[in-house]
Amino acid sequence: MSATLELARELIQRPSVTPEDAGCQTLVAERLAAAGFGAEWLNAAGVTNLWAQRGTERPLFCFLGHTDVVPSGPESAWQHPPFQPIVENGCLYGRGAADMKGSVAAFVAAVERFVARHPDHAGAIAVLLTSDEEGPAVDGTRRVVETLAARGAAIDYCLVGEPSSQARLGDEYKVGRRGSLTGHLTVHGEQGHVAYPHQADNPIHAFAPALQELVATEWDQGDADFPPTSFQISNIQAGTGADNVIPGAMEVVFNLRYAPAVSAEELQERIESILHRHGVHHTLHWRHSGAPFATREGALIDAVEQAVTAHTGQCPRRSTSGGTSDGRFMGPTGAQVVELGPLNATIHKANEHVAVADLEALEAIYFDILQHLLAPAD
């Protein structure tokens, strides 16, 4: 059994449902200590965070991952118990196999092999793991990055092991992500009888013209790497349930996924302007989950594309699609950030799995990326 598969199995059998770590990071820290890494625990609010580093010189290359997983759901929906790693028909089954304990195992094994071959490698290597990626993502990577920034630490390259592949390993990798901005809007009216609308103020009617404009607005045109910003209503609630009562208030939740062409502050100002222009009496609270980031060129891009091409025979597509990841906390630091991992077809589903051959190839790709960036000059 390979080092990658063995470690992946050991991680999967630990039921680390977010924000629990269940000993996963201790296992990794022990493995990395044997390879000359120092470990620092930056835990906060019940979240386990490991920062392990070898070397102090620049450039600093960081593998970023998470050890927490989403709940398994009904065990009856699984072919095998979700926290009992099973290899069947060439695939490793278990919660976290693809998202993202398989990637963690692959990059730890790659680091071990690289350090053994190049004990005097250039720069420094770090591994950052958190148990708060699948949850609120407040006390995990975000907190660690803030701590490192306060120390003046600079990360040059960051590879996030998120499952980026679509149909085959390495066919696609992320070079950026859109930002996410959520608004919690309360439209204030006055409750009354539907037969006497002149004695009430219907918040639904008051908001309707503004909603039409919000939905029709072109926020930006995107660019070569990012689609235009999208505005989506996710929840609307109003009324008492009775058919003869005009509601006194309406709650609306909306989200914008936005490109670097526009800022969160600009979007907030434009939305407030629309609401005021339509005379909507409202209260609006914002939650900014993360700014967009993009790595459009650089040594990390070159290393990833060369390594993937060498092991798959095809250059990976660059993509910025999908939801947010912890890469959003690394992007603003100035680091070159990419996401590269296994297939995402079964993530968060029953019978989550990853091909064992893909895990082995992923370890080799990660190893080659380190070779390109940190191998000592001959």
From Swiss-Prot:
Catalytic reaction equation(s): N-succinyl-(2S,6S)-2,6-diaminopimelate + H2O = (2S,6S)-2,6-diaminopimelate + succinate
Positions of the catalytic residues: D68, E133 (proton acceptor)
N-terminal signal peptide: none
Biochemical pathway: Amino-acid biosynthesis; L-lysine biosynthesis via DAP pathway; LL-2,6-diaminopimelate from (S)-tetrahydrodipicolinate (succinylase route): step 3/3
UniProt keyword annotation of Amino-acid biosynthesis present: yes
Binding-site residues for Zn(2+) 1, renumbered to this chain: H66, D99, E162
Entries under InterPro entries matching the protein: ArgE/DapE_CS, Bact_exopeptidase_dim_dom, DapE_proteobac, Peptidase_M20, Peptidase_M20_dimer, Peptidase_M20A
Gene Ontology terms, MF aspect: acetylornithine deacetylase activity; cobalt ion binding; succinyl-diaminopimelate desuccinylase activity; zinc ion binding
Pfam families found in the cross-reference section: M20_dimer, Peptidase_M20
Cofactor note: Binds 2 Zn(2+) or Co(2+) ions per subunit.
EC number: 3.5.1.18
The protein's assembly and partners: Homodimer.
HAMAP family: DapE
Role summary: Catalyzes the hydrolysis of N-succinyl-L,L-diaminopimelic acid (SDAP), forming succinate and LL-2,6-diaminopimelate (DAP), an intermediate involved in the bacterial biosynthesis of lysine and meso-diaminopimelic acid, an essential component of bacterial cell walls.
The protein's name in its UniProt record: Succinyl-diaminopimelate desuccinylase
UniProt source species: Halorhodospira halophila (strain DSM 244 / SL1)
Lineage of the organism: Bacteria, Pseudomonadati, Pseudomonadota, Gammaproteobacteria, Chromatiales
